[in-house]
A protein has these predicted regions:
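C-terminal folded interaction/catalytic domains of modular proteins
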Residues: 2-188
Length: 188
């Protein structure tokens, strides 16, 4: 009888551990989905010159002016007060290093208008914006998935065609399960 009770306690303990592990995994997935949803209205702008000032307020003001000029000058988007929910630099400030800038919009439409008009950067002749690039703000798991997809495509390219990958660009297009890698030849 004592052995049977001990067995029942172990089964209950194992069942409790399994339930706890499942609940932790569900919470992790829910948190990831919420994080992805929160990032949907954000863009990351790279190589924006950073004002060389010790004053945080001066640097923030400079960044806000640059973003407003960029959106107006390149994308013809008139940003009003309150259209940008958040805007800050990513990483630690160091002298002479331009950190990426995260910009979060109040409305998804602003971000979508920017991302669908990225071709305007190539036609842009304003020197102030040369070298600047914009990308989606992605969850770390998404970034890793995209990186792995590109690496796999490069390996497959080398195996099938034997041609060096240096002459090609590999780009991931699509969303979610509909993502695929396309390759195109670099221009000389």
């Amino acid at each position: 009888m004592i052995g049977g009770t001990h067995s029942t306690v172990n089964e209950a303990s194992n069942e409790g551990m399994i339930k706890l592990a499942v609940q932790e995994e569900i919470n992790k997935k829910v948190g990831e989905v919420k994080d992805i949803e929160n990032r949907k209205k954000n863009v990351i702008i790279y190589r924006v010159p950073e004002k060389n000032s010790k004053s945080v307020l001066e640097r923030r003001e400079h960044d806000a002016d640059f973003v407003k000029d960029l959106l107006d000058g390149v994308f013809n988007i008139d940003i009003q007060e309150g259209d940008i929910e958040k805007m800050y630099r990513l990483g630690q400030w160091t002298d002479g290093n331009a950190r990426p800038m995260l910009v979060g919009f109040k409305q998804y439409e602003h971000k979508e208008q920017i991302m669908s008009s990225l071709w305007k950067f190539r036609e842009n002749s304003i020197p102030k914006f040369q070298g600047v690039s914009i990308s989606h703000d992605r969850h770390p798991a998404e970034r890793l998935e995209i990186k792995n997809m590109v690496e796999d495509a490069k390996k497959k390219h080398l195996e099938e065609e034997g041609d060096d990958t240096e002459n090609y660009w590999f780009r991931v297009v699509g969303h979610g399960s509909k993502r695929k890698v396309i390759k195109f030849k670099k221009r000389n």
